[in-house]
Amino acid sequence: MVVVAILAAGRGTRMKSDLPKVLHPLGGRSLVERVIDSVEPLSPSRRLVIVGYQAEQVKTGLQSLHLEFVEQTVQLGTGHAIQQLLPHLEGYTGDLLVLNGDVPLLRTQTLEQLLQTHQTNQNAATILTSHLPNPKGYGRVFCNGNNIVQQIVEDKDCSPAQRQNHRINAGIYCFRWENLAQVLPHLEANNAQKEYYLTDAVTQVGQVMAVDVEDYQEILGINDRLQLATAYEILQRRVKEQWMMAGVTLIDPNSITIDDTVDLQPDVIIEPQTHLRGNTFIQTGSRIGPGSLIENSQLGANVTVQYSVITDSTIQNGAKIGPYAHLRGHAQVGANCRIGNFVELKNTELGDRTNVAHLSYLGDATAGTQVNIGAGTITANYDGVKKHRTKIGDRTKTGSNSVLVAPVTLGDDVYVAAGSTITEDVPNDSLVIARTRQVVKPGWRKKSGES
């Protein structure tokens, strides 16, 4: 049995932000959400998040995850933070996994290894360590040949010889809670910062073993925007390598970004300068980009998208989107549709084989199958107070520069003459002309007296 505690009380002053550090986004998820994601496969019995700075904002940002929150009203160090758990874990006899809310790149496999080593060896504590190329600023961990920790020395207290040791404390621990609970009340703040350090407890609980993480990048903490950008680069490399190995083609990967919440099927091709975000799913054979943004959208097989923005929308097999189209607000595009340049769809549903080829806005509309929307067709959906729907039947064709003033319904097989403004419903099989008659006055200029 394991309980997880996540330290998320710090202010993060080096971020220079009003937003709590742990809520800063990294590839579509906040830093602390990524930490929470990494422990979910461990099936912890409880997930406790220790909050302090802007506690209510952090709670609100995580409320959908059904966590337990423990407040550290004054931030007096990591040991003090874990002391706040004492009344919440009274009588608990299992293990406590302690993580930092600003270390978002940890893999679940690493935590599984830490927990397995801890439980197999019946350690009082097991700590995660790593060998850094440049360990400056990190506490050094000294072990015997069996990885039993002999000493942890803070960087500022290291002798020149001790600084040659590049094995550092990652600040991630697994404790036998009964042992730790006995030590926590006796921690002392005997340091310049007058803080209570969890490392002081580590040396007092009993046998402590160290486990090395293979990739030191996993334990990188985020303290400023530069480190946030570095973490994003690492995360993107992981995600893109995963998809390329799974049969997805990325043309110029360095110019492409993909959230790790995105799902792609084999034989998808992603062109340069394309960005895939949120809960996006793209099926096999689709070609996306160049220069496109797709967010929280589902695309079928063999869809093509060029230089377009698609959010919160669904596109069926074989549709062609762009260039320079904008789909949003739960747009639904049927199979083998064509959405051309400078077309915007908002909260609009199109049936199969419907074309909106260029220069049109369809908002709050429904169009059937094999509809052809002429260039410059607009649905006037807003009356200044509320929005209304437009309904267009199967095989209907609108001429160029038509305006459909909602609420209005066009039946099946309707022809709308170019330049018409439609304000009333049109029955099936009709030609509708709603424009003023052209008047030509020969010789008007001379008769008017204009020179």
Curated annotation (Swiss-Prot):
The gene is glmU. Pfam families: Hexapep, NTP_transf_3. CDD domains: GT2_GlmU_N_bac, LbH_GlmU_C. It catalyses: alpha-D-glucosamine 1-phosphate + acetyl-CoA = N-acetyl-alpha-D-glucosamine 1-phosphate + CoA + H(+); N-acetyl-alpha-D-glucosamine 1-phosphate + UTP + H(+) = UDP-N-acetyl-alpha-D-glucosamine + diphosphate. Binds 1 Mg(2+) ion per subunit. Its EC number is 2.7.7.23, 2.3.1.157. One of its GO terms (molecular function) is glucosamine-1-phosphate N-acetyltransferase activity. The active site is at residue 358. Residues 247-451 are annotated as: N-acetyltransferase. This is Bifunctional protein GlmU. It comes from Trichormus variabilis (strain ATCC 29413 / PCC 7937).
